[in-house]
Amino acid sequence: MKIVLQHLTKKFPARSSVRGRKNREDVIAVNDFDFEIPDGKLIGLLGPSGCGKSTALNLICGLLKPTEGKIFFGEDDVTGLPPENRGVGMVFQNYALYPHLTVEKNIQFPLENLKGADKLSKEEMSKRVLEAAKLVQIDHLLERKPNELSGGQQQRVAIARALVKLPRVLLLDEPLSNLD
């Protein structure tokens, strides 16, 4: 499924100082961005720190709302859809793992709150978790906690967690950092 971004813009308002005066102007993180990703293609966004790469990913997955513009998955306008209804898996730069949960439970976490027809049995959840863990070669680490893993292993947990819901779109922010 192709992804199309049309005139995508994200502005963050200026922050006020303690005395109520503005200490800077509005920040335009993404400005009139037009882009098309063909179906089945893997692409990378390259640019210097602060140029809007992560903001663009957060707009695509729905964690941020665009100031202007549209986002299409195939023919569907997903601009107004909440993140949970977009079918996007997101791997964040900082992994966002739950330190008190095992690797298995971290991967399983997004499956726990599925509702209605999407709700899975415990057996199906376990099967999906094992498949995702095998895919990223961490199936031997399922009983460990995140603090027992290397940075690369933690990133693999985050990737497996994003894959376990079988997303239509997979977004990775800084995907090669810490991989071993």
PLM region spans:
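Catalytic Walker B motif of ABC-type/P-loop ATPase nucleotide-binding domains
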Residues: L170-D173
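Conserved ABC ATPase signature
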Residues: K145-L149, Q153
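Short coil-to-helix segment of the ABC ATPase nucleotide-binding domain corresponding to the Q-loop/switch region
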Residues: L101-P110
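The feature captures the beta-strand-to-loop junction immediately N-terminal to the Walker
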Residues: L46-P48
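Helix-to-loop junction immediately C-terminal to a conserved catalytic motif
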Residues: C61
